[in-house]
UniProtKB/Swiss-Prot annotation:
The N-terminus is blocked. Mesophyll and bundle sheath cells. Pathway: Photosynthesis; C4 acid pathway; Amino-acid degradation; L-alanine degradation via transaminase pathway; pyruvate from L-alanine: step 1/1. This is Alanine aminotransferase 2. InterPro entries: ALAT1/2-like, Aminotransferase_I/II_large, PyrdxlP-dep_Trfase, PyrdxlP-dep_Trfase_major, PyrdxlP-dep_Trfase_small. Keywords: Aminotransferase, Pyridoxal phosphate, Transferase. GO terms for molecular function: L-alanine:2-oxoglutarate aminotransferase activity; pyridoxal phosphate binding. It comes from Panicum miliaceum (Proso millet). Transfer of C3 units between the cytosol of mesophyll and bundle sheath cells to maintain a nitrogen-carbon balance in the C4-dicarboxylic pathway.
Length: 482
């Protein structure tokens, strides 16, 4: 009897879904890593450098001490009863852990919580949002999630009814959006960021793409904006954000604001403004604009990817719609408690006067300043190579250089049945051990080719990354020169 489950009879939405950040090149890199372990010296490099994903601690970034102290005490509350704890943990970490545990029934961090998250932790997150924006925030609007990704999936599940429902997404975009739209059976409506203007977002292009989609019978439900940008690293100007908010209001679109890199700003002339702050600043009240803001503990200076913490703040939805969002959250029971605690800490870190403040600020500033230096070093290195142009990384954790490939390289890629930038990235991996993501995994203007490279290798390894990359690129260009 034939197998009852085969690729041919799987859900076509799953087959359509792609996620390049952990795709073919990363799988090949993992095989090469195994080869290095079992056959040392068998490859032209001695380690794999994963520049494909925003996973800071996997590349050596250290966690923030205060956050980990509080998590340790919350996970093992009996430590709070021991006298020696006072000499091992800071006083404010001890008091914060006690305060957090007082909001958790039975101090049981291993128990399920309310489906939106523990109320006291949502109160803390709301207080952090209010402090950041200068406008009130309500714990009832907060849904704590296992990172930002489940929140995105929940909103796609809510908004997409069939393939005639569209979501406006930036190109290039983080593949979570194309993947989740495909999984839920919707249509991605692309709008292109302008590489020539530093990955600018033009309202005129948004209008054009919206009108074009509607003319084809697509009911465009929402606009996704990633700020700071992934994979492009730009930080939106405040006036641009005002135009985006007005556009969504005028066109009846839900604004899905991916703001997980809000702490990652590397230029003095830009700063992060949440879309909620912008909406309130232009005069839109609580009920005037449906807005979902996503935040995560995985990025910023904290980089706690494996803890799976995050939240979405939902405003501007009617009570009946909010009930449906809550129902989706309830199906998933709740997010993990460690991630919930960490989300509350990220939004309420130590303040001036707290015992941990000086050490916390030194850790935070050290990480962000180092990331800025790494971004500049890689940007300069890319721009000094033949056939590569790279915009400034204003924020986030990535550079997205354009690779101007020779015609012979494009023909060789076609013969290998690869996208040209995937062909380049695969050769880069096999020659140097450096893992990057082809731009074709994020979307790009047809006829252009890019790679996404994180700025996350530790600062003392950046010179080696640059040296390896330069040697490879020069040899590649010489091999395929027209």
């Amino acid at each position: 009897m034939a197998a009852t489950v085969a690729v041919e009879n799987l859900n076509p939405k799953v087959l359509k879904c792609e996620y390049a950040v952990r795709g073919e090149i990363v799988i090949h890199a993992q095989h090469l890593q195994q080869q290095l372990q079992t056959q040392p010296g068998s490859l032209p490099f001695d380690e794999i450098l994963y520049c494909n994903i925003g996973n800071p601690q996997s590349l050596g970034q250290q966690p923030v001490t205060f956050f980990r102290e509080v998590l340790a005490l919350c996970d093992h509350p009996c430590l709070l009863e021991k006298e020696e704890t006072k000499s091992l943990f800071s006083a404010d970490a001890i008091s914060r852990a006690k305060q957090i545990l007082s909001t958790i029934p039975g101090r049981a961090t291993g128990a399920y919580s309310h489906s939106q998250g523990i109320k006291g932790l949502r109160d803390a997150i709301a207080a952090g949002i209010a402090s950041r924006d200068g406008f009130p925030a309500n714990a009832d609007d907060i849904f704590v999630t296992d990172g930002a990704s489940p929140g995105v999936h929940m909103m796609m599940q809510l908004l997409i009814r069939n393939e005639k429902d569209g979501i406006l997404c930036p190109i290039p975009q983080y593949p979570l959006y194309s993947a989740s739209i495909a999984l839920h059976g919707g249509t991605l409506v692309p709008y292109y960021l302008d590489e020539k203007t530093g990955w600018g977002l033009e309202i005129s292009d948004l209008k054009k793409q919206l009108e074009d989609a509607r003319s084809k019978g697509i009911d465009v439900r929402a606009l996704v904006v990633i700020n700071p940008g992934n994979p492009t690293g730009q930080v939106l100007a405040e006036d641009n954000q005002c135009d985006i908010v007005r556009f969504c209001k005028n066109e009846g679109l839900v604004l899905l604001a991916d703001e997980v890199y809000q702490e990652n700003i590397y230029v003095d002339d830009k700063k992060f403004n949440s879309f909620k702050k912008i909406a309130r600043s232009v005069g839109y009240g609580e009920d005037d604009l449906p807005l979902v803001s996503f935040q995560s503990v995985s990025k910023g200076y904290y980089g706690e990817c494996g803890k799976r913490g995050g939240y979405m703040e939902i405003t501007g939805f009617s009570a009946p719609v909010r009930e449906q969002i809550y129902k989706i959250a309830s199906v998933n029971l709740c997010s993990n408690i460690t991630g919930q605690i960490l989300a509350s800490l990220v939004m309420n870190p130590p303040k001036v006067g707290d015992e941990s403040y000086a050490a916390y600020k030194a850790e935070k500033d050290g990480i962000l300043q180092s990331l800025a230096r790494r971004a500049k070093a890689l940007e300069d290195a890319f721009n000094n190579l033949e056939g590569i142009s790279c915009n400034k990384a204003e924020g986030a954790m990535y550079l997205f250089p354009q690779i101007h490939l020779p015609k012979k390289a494009i023909e060789a890629a076609k013969a290998a049945n690869k996208a040209p930038d995937a062909f380049y990235a695969l050769r880069l991996l096999e020659s140097t051990g450096i893992v990057v993501v082809p731009g074709s995994g994020f979307g790009q203007v047809p006829g252009t080719w890019h790679i996404r490279c994180t700025i996350l290798p530790q600062e003392d390894k950046i010179p080696a990354v640059i040296t390896r990359f330069k040697a490879f690129h020069e040899a590649f260009m010489a091999e395929y020169r027209d």
